[in-house]
Amino acid sequence: MKTIIVFLSLLVLATKFGDANEGVNQEQMKEVIQNEFREDFLNEMAAMSLLQQLEAIESTLLEKEADRNSRQKRCNGENVPCGPNHSTCCSGLSCEETFGYGWWYDTPFCVKPSKG
């Protein structure tokens, strides 16, 4: 019974003095929240500034790329179908009928030229 009275008295004291600190805690929480929002805002502004700089660099690079006409000619690699309906073979390869799989697909393939 004595322990229950002690715990009840501690509960009453904690409730009474806990309310006194509530205003201080709320002010501290407001300060913390405001500081976090300031930091988030500053971080967001820095990120936006960095993004704008990257976009500017990217646009200048794309302009240089467009000026150079850098598109490469497409060609077929080794063991790729070639012929009138397909693009040409890359350098070092020739479009030939092969016995291995060309007869199955009924089309010539890009292969290394035979030495003979």
Swiss-Prot record:
The propeptide segment or segments lie at 21-74
Q: Where are the transmembrane segments?
A: none
GO MF, one annotated term: toxin activity
**Principal location:** secreted
Query: Which Pfam families does the annotation name?
Result: Toxin_22
Q: Does the keyword Transport apply?
A: no
Q: Which family does it belong to?
A: Belongs to the neurotoxin 14 (magi-1) family. 06 (ICK-Trit) subfamily.
Q: Quote the protein name from its UniProt record.
A: U16-barytoxin-Tl1f
Taxonomic classification, please?
Eukaryota, Metazoa, Ecdysozoa, Arthropoda, Chelicerata
